């Protein structure tokens, strides 16, 4: 997992509440458990004018010109600004995978569905919670200023606007440690690899009959 320390990125505003995981990555694309290949199908039903299917050449599909991620001013965005209850619906790690592979490192919203919120941290995506009034103001500023960027400092737990105003956010210390150091569940386990091997060697000596 890529470490998350500091980043400055273009903001894309997704002005819709209660965006569920099937809208983030539709169910027909969930057949793979690899973490790659989902970016082109992020928000598939909104980005394209046809019905997407696995294995399609997305470069040949008709784009929906009204969808925010298809607008030229938001190309290359790495910060997604969203509304309340983002990531609701069924549990699927494919949702943060798709957001990450598209290029988003950060989502900012007033609230999230619990399972999506937890899955995001485990997959290198930082979901920031800000008060609704601050999110409303960010939407106004993003829409009024082309090329609007935010700077996020995870260690300091701050979001800095272009006008210099600093917004603080809360994050669980353990989740913060994992993101700063790029540690997913496998990475955390491998930190104790020596202790695990020592236990296995000792257990093999104590219970040799189990290994015959």
Curated annotation (Swiss-Prot):
It is an enzyme of class 4 (lyase). Belongs to the LeuD family. LeuD type 1 subfamily. Gene3D superfamilies: Aconitase, domain 4 (3.20.19.10). GO terms for molecular function: 3-isopropylmalate dehydratase activity. Catalyzes the isomerization between 2-isopropylmalate and 3-isopropylmalate, via the formation of 2-isopropylmaleate. Disulfide bonds: none annotated. It catalyses: (2R,3S)-3-isopropylmalate = (2S)-2-isopropylmalate. Pathway: Amino-acid biosynthesis; L-leucine biosynthesis; L-leucine from 3-methyl-2-oxobutanoate: step 2/4. This is 3-isopropylmalate dehydratase small subunit. Its EC number is 4.2.1.33. It comes from Pseudomonas aeruginosa (strain ATCC 15692 / DSM 22644 / CIP 104116 / JCM 14847 / LMG 12228 / 1C / PRS 101 / PAO1). InterPro entries: 3-IsopropMal_deHydase_ssu (IPR004431), Aconitase/3IPM_dehydase_swvl (IPR015928), AconitaseA/IPMdHydase_ssu_swvl (IPR000573), IPMI_Swivel (IPR033940), LeuD (IPR050075). GO terms for cellular component: 3-isopropylmalate dehydratase complex. Heterodimer of LeuC and LeuD. GO terms for biological process: L-leucine biosynthetic process. Keywords: Amino-acid biosynthesis, Branched-chain amino acid biosynthesis, Leucine biosynthesis, Lyase. The keyword Lyase applies.
